[in-house]
Amino acid sequence: GAQLNVLSLTSEENMMTGEITNEQKRIDLPQMTEPVKNIFVDPRQQWLYVINGRAQADVFSLRDKSLNGRYKLLENGDAEITASTQLVGGISLIFGDSKGGLAQWFMARDPDGESRLKQIRTFQMGTTPIVEITAEERRKGFIALDASGKLGVFHSTAHRTLLVDQVVEGQGIFGLSPRANRVIVEAGGKIQPLLLENPHPEVSWSALWSKVWYENYDEPKYVWQSTAANTDFEPKLSLAPLTFGTLKAAFYAMLLAAPLAVAAAIYTAYFMAPGMRRKV
């Protein structure tokens, strides 16, 4: 097995003298029983994700210096994790397996209030192993390449498979531009540039009208929040709260307006002076 050690470096600057003090802390974690394939750390440095070859993720709490849990990533015992990455923001993990499947996982609280790694949504690209996954730098989208040379474009929040196309023959590697509008694929010693037009992948029927499980939420919800100050923001475009709010406002307005209109009509017809009624 492998021994994991986490080294934390902290720098503090004295406001009066400008002197910088460096502090180093070492966190010893339990020894791993399986070979480690990948390691991820969330931006807040709270969780350490260790992916091993048995399609299992060990999650460690860096604050408590303890094991949060061991999570089975695949139900199929014959499959294994072949590729993995973090989405922009570092909260979600995307795993690709040997059967062509992809899954999004992130930490969420269970009914007991404990944080657990949970599978949020899945995608199916084909039947051949996923060899590489790259996340977009500005949106909650990602691109995957399988062993047969198929390229897939996905968006996590909208739960959309935007494109699956054969771009090369056989296994290759690829690179994605910062704006996610160009892809370069290398296979068999040849480089193939591709132009990707993907203007609004975050919009889908489920994103607009269904409950969506957003990052940092404990369950799927209807939420509208179209913008934020940070660049790794996850758009929340549910029209359900807007529609319900509009209908509710109209209903309460009619409760007040309808009796006033009926009372005004009765007064005009039976009690208003004839001269005034002609002017009205």
Annotate the PLM regions.
Residues 1, 48-52, 93-97, 142-146, ...:
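Conserved beta-strand element within WD40/beta-propeller blades
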Residues 1-5, 32-41, 46-53:
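Alpha-solenoid helical-repeat scaffolds
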Residues 7, 31-32, 46-49, 60, ...:
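Solenoidal tandem-repeat scaffolds enriched in leucines and small polar residues
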Residues 98-104, 116-131, 146-148, 152-155:
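Beta-strand-enriched, solvent-exposed domains that form extended recognition/catalytic surfaces
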Residues 253-280:
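Transmembrane-helix boundary motif in ABC transporter permease subunits
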